[in-house]
Amino acid sequence: MASIVQPSPTFPALNLRRSSLIRPPSSVRFPLKCNAADPYKFDGGNSAGFHLLTGDTVPASFSRTRLEDSIYQNTTRLRIFSGTANPILAQEISCYLGLDLGKIKIKRFADGEIYVQLQESVRGCDVFLVQPTCPPANENLMELLVMIDACRRASAKTITAVIPYFGYARADRKTQGRESIAAKLVANLITQSGADRVLACDLHSGQSMGYFDIPVDHVYGQPVILDYLASKAISSEDLVVVSPDVGGVARARAFAKKLSDAPLAIVDKRRHGHNVAEVMNLIGDVKGKVAIMVDDMIDTAGTISKGAALLHQEGAREVYACTTHAVFSPPAISRLSSGLFQEVIITNTIPLSEKNYFPQLTVLSVANLLGETIWRVHDDCSGAIEPFSTLGID
């Protein structure tokens, strides 16, 4: 699906010292990718994505740095390491910062145990470990814990767990008796393993930040998606933002406010079991409108697809789905590509296999948002300046 993206007034260009990065062609095509020169601006057409970038495969153009005053690899105390969960995103972050990814050896023994060895010194360094705990969640979580432990034993000054997608985030409270609160347990594990800070993107609920006994920087992917939607030049009179459930109303309301204070509609549903949802009613008017459905994640797509079907029944002209985290558990792909949606807009917090691409899918990159946040944390700068104040960084 081709998209022509024009500059948008929604988020003005950041007045930061950056130079652009040029992405060369690749066999994997993303309908849209973030322009590394500006976290809020995009390149139209088919910008390239990369399956895996290593020291031997990184294009020469990626050697350009984020800053006019280059970060010198041999003198900086900033180190970025990637786990095996999302090396593409980690490479994009390091390219934005003008750094090479740290050298690390990660392997599985025959019995499935995880082995991690840092292959360069991190003594006295600010270390950032990029590892979403996406499926397989248990494997990726354990790998992150072992990476943190390795950095602590190697005398790193500070260790920040960069978790673009925080697994177990939905288990943040008891819904029935004698249940665990797994989100709190995972927070304890990360803290006790030796992390000094967590950088997470679009947590399922705000209270999850309180589960940690260490600082948490909460980065929102919302500005990236908003800027892309603003570039589509849809009349504000035709827009309506839809929350797929009552729990997402606050998120959808904030989203609508940024889109020219668009009206809000709510899909009222009742869940009869895990990953099973039933649409009950629509609160609001969508007749003849372009409906923008907003959620923090899409798992099996049951909630959002049934909501989209209801919106069409109620007379919506077009339906867009917007989410930060594309978990895409079966049968999500078949539901999302069934024709209910004009476009499905996601970010790259979770790696997406090539077989899961479909024509309506658009992928945006959050690498620059995470890279800028990492730099500000390392440089002891506040993120609470416009437009970074929209990211919720303190």
UniProtKB/Swiss-Prot annotation:
Can you state which reaction this protein catalyses?
Answer: D-ribose 5-phosphate + ATP = 5-phospho-alpha-D-ribose 1-diphosphate + AMP + H(+)
Q: What is its main location?
A: plastid
Where do the annotations place Mg(2+) binding? 202, 204, 213, 217
The protein's matches in InterPro entries, at most eight in alphabetical order, are given as: PRib_PP_synth_CS (IPR000842), Pribosyltran_N (IPR029099), PRibTrfase_dom (IPR000836), PRTase-like (IPR029057), Rib-P_diPkinase (IPR005946), Rib-P_diPkinase_bac (IPR037515)
Give the enzyme's EC designation: 2.7.6.1
Keyword check for Transmembrane helix: no
Q: Where in the cell is it found?
A: Plastid, Chloroplast
List the PANTHER family.
RIBOSE-PHOSPHATE DIPHOSPHOKINASE FAMILY MEMBER, RIBOSE-PHOSPHATE PYROPHOSPHOKINASE 5, CHLOROPLASTIC
- Which NCBIfam families did the record assign? PRK01259.1 (NF002320), PRK02812.1 (NF002758), ribP_PPkin (TIGR01251)
Protein name (database record)? Ribose-phosphate pyrophosphokinase 5, chloroplastic
